[in-house]
Design a protein with these regions (language model features):
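Short aromatic-enriched loop/helix-cap "lid" or pocket-rim segments at secondary-structure transitions
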Residues: 72, 111, 149-151, 173-174, ...
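Short, well-ordered alpha-helices that flank and scaffold nucleotide-derived cofactor binding pockets
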Residues: 49, 53, 114-118, 180
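Conserved beta-strand scaffold positions in the cores of enzyme catalytic domains, especially
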Residues: 5-7, 58-60, 136, 189-192
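C-terminal catalytic histidine-bearing segment of alpha/beta-hydrolase fold enzymes
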Residues: 187-233
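The feature captures the conserved acid-bearing segment of alpha/beta-hydrolase catalytic domains
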Residues: 124-187
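Serine-hydrolase catalytic machinery in alpha/beta-hydrolase-like enzymes
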Residues: 6-98, 200-213
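Primarily recognizes the serine-hydrolase "nucleophile elbow" in alpha/beta-hydrolase
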Residues: 86-152
Length: 233
């Protein structure tokens, strides 16, 4: 299916930030993509283009890189505010709303869907509203934000969850725990990628990162195809 691709600026509380839009012709759904700590959706563009080719308009905000592996309440809430601006502007009641995120981006999607997240210092983060996602595709999410009682009991949506067995940033044991918690509320498709690390899900690796996934091209093609099938099912 045809789609157009543009990058433009929008405003949030008089502050401008950038979004990339991959707009599908006669879109079947709207996908909000949320990048990880680095904040750039450009590193995932091949994946997002495949999703757009399958008939979904993709909205991908650009964020400033988080300076620390343990982000603060203020840093995370700033991203959530940008995401809520995007959701208000680009989600429509007549179109299915889907979230797709990697690492801390996947974590923020869970918060937007109703999860009660706490920072490592115990401060609550979260949106002003609970957004009704039809489905969430979560790649190597940061789980520790939701390990307190009742954190995810209000999340009620279909989940596609993938994690790498060789992930040392968000270990597979945490992903399995997240699966066990989430499947109490609804259906969870979980896939543990045997050779994948934390950054294997990025089409363009960050500087100085070597991937444990030996055949990246085949892996990324299969990843994109499976995610596209999930969001359009």
């Amino acid at each position: 299916m045809d789609f157009s691709e543009i990058t433009q600026s929008i405003q949030n509380n008089k502050k401008e930030f950038t979004i990339t839009i991959l707009e599908a012709t006669q879109a079947l759904c709207v996908v909000i993509f949320v990048a990880g700590r680095g904040g750039s959706p450009v590193r995932h563009l091949p994946l997002l283009r495949v999703v757009a080719q399958h008939g979904c308009t993709v909205i991908a905000p650009h964020f400033e890189m988080l300076p620390s592996l343990t982000p603060t309440k203020e840093e995370l809430n700033a991203r959530i505010e940008q995401l809520e601006t995007v959701l208000r502007d680009y989600s429509h009641s007549h179109q299915t709303l889907i979230g797709l995120g990697h690492s801390i981006g996947a974590t923020l999607l869970l918060a937007l869907a109703g999860g009660k997240a706490l920072t490592f210092s115990g401060h609550g983060i979260g949106p002003h509203s609970i957004w009704k996602f039809e489905r969430l595709a979560l790649l190597a999410p940061s789980v520790d934000f939701f390990l307190h009682p009742g954190a995810l009991q209000t999340v009620n949506t279909q989940i596609y969850l993938r994690n790498g067995r060789k992930d040392t940033v968000t270990p597979p044991s945490k992903a399995l725990l997240l699966k066990q918690i989430l499947e109490k509320q609804g259906h969870v498709d979980f896939l543990l990628d045997e050779e994948a690390g934390h950054f294997s899900y990025m089409d363009e690796l960050p500087p100085q990162i070597e991937d444990s996934q030996s055949n990246r091209e085949v892996f990324l093609v299969d990843l994109a195809r499976n995610i596209a099938q999930f969001v359009t099912t």
